[in-house]
Amino acid sequence: IEEDSFCMNQRAFPADLTYQVVIRLRTSTNGWLFGRVQKPDVVITSIPGGEKWDVTAAPVRIPQIWEFVPLTSMPKDFAEWKTKNWESAPSSGLFDKSTSPQTEVRIPNPLNTGGVDTAINWLNYWMPITGDKATAAPGVWSIRNLAPNEMNNSSSCYDSNNAQYKEKRVTGMVTSNAMITSAGPPQFDAKDQSLNYQVAGPHFEKDGKTLFRGTYDLIMRKDVARCLYGFTDAPIKASISIINANGEEIIATEQIAERNNASGEWITLGKYGFTFSSPRLRVKLTQEKVVAPAANPVQSNKSVMKSNKATITCIKGKISKKITGVNPKCPSGFRKK
C-alpha cells in the first residue's frame, strides 16, 4: 500500500473484500491454473494482439508453521524419524544453527517438495509437537499457470494441446487455502468416476482453539469435463464431497456453490467451511441420459372408408330375408317389412 507516510508498506487484506484484476496480455495463456484465492470469477476474451483477463476473487489465509521447539521436548524417535524422512527433503535444516551446541529444533512448513503424501507425513509428525495449530495465517491473493513438470502426470484432457479442442486456451483452475495441496489438477479416478484433490493443514488457528476453515474452488471448461468423462453436449451436473483420512464424509458449513459465467463455457464449483487435517475433495460429474423421442407411428397409406351400408328386412308370406347394401332393395316378390 502506497501512502504519503509509507512506501510500499505491506498490510493485511481487509476482511470480507474481493479484488478485481484486469490485465492485457500480448500472447494467449493456456494450460491449467493454480490459485490462492476464493470464489474466483474469471473471464478471458480475445483482443487484437492478445488476450484480456478479468479476474475477481477474494483473498485467502494460508496457515503456516514456524516453531522452535527445545530438543529435549522432541519425541524419542526424532533422530530416527529425521534420518528416514527429512535428510533427502528440503534443503533447510531442522536445527537452529544460532546455538552451539544445537538445543532447538526449527519446525518449518512441510512443503510439497516431496509430493503431497510425503508432506502429509511430515505434517502428521509435527502436529502433536506444535499443538496442531498454525503459527500464522497471512493473507494471499495469487493465480499462476502450472509448468509441465507440475502437472503430476495428469490426464491429457487438461492439456491445451489436446486434439479434441478447437484452440489452445486455459483449461481450468483449482484453488484452496490449505497449507498442503495436491500437485497439478484434480486426478481423475476412472473406477469411481471422480476428480480427487488432496489437501492438508493444521486443525486450529494460532490460538489453538479456533478451528481453521478450509476453502476449495474448481473451475473447469465443460469440454474438459466431456473429455474426461466421455460426455455428450447434454447438461452436466456436479457434486462435491469431503472425505477424511478414515474414509468418512465431512460435513462442510457451506455447501456446494455452482456459478455460471455469461458464456456458459465453465463448470464452477466450490466447497467452504470444512476442517483439516488431511481431507480429500471428491468431485463427481454426471449427465442425464438423453432419451430419444418416440418414433411417430407409421400412418397407413390405405384410406379408411366410412361404411355407408344399411340393412333392411324383406318378407314374402312367412319368409323373411335381411338385405344389406349401400342402397338395399327387396327381391322381386318380397316387400320391405
Write out the residue ranges for each language-model feature.
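Mature, structured domains enriched in cysteine- and short glycine motifs
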Residues: 302-337
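Extended, non-transmembrane interaction/recognition domains
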Residues: 1-311
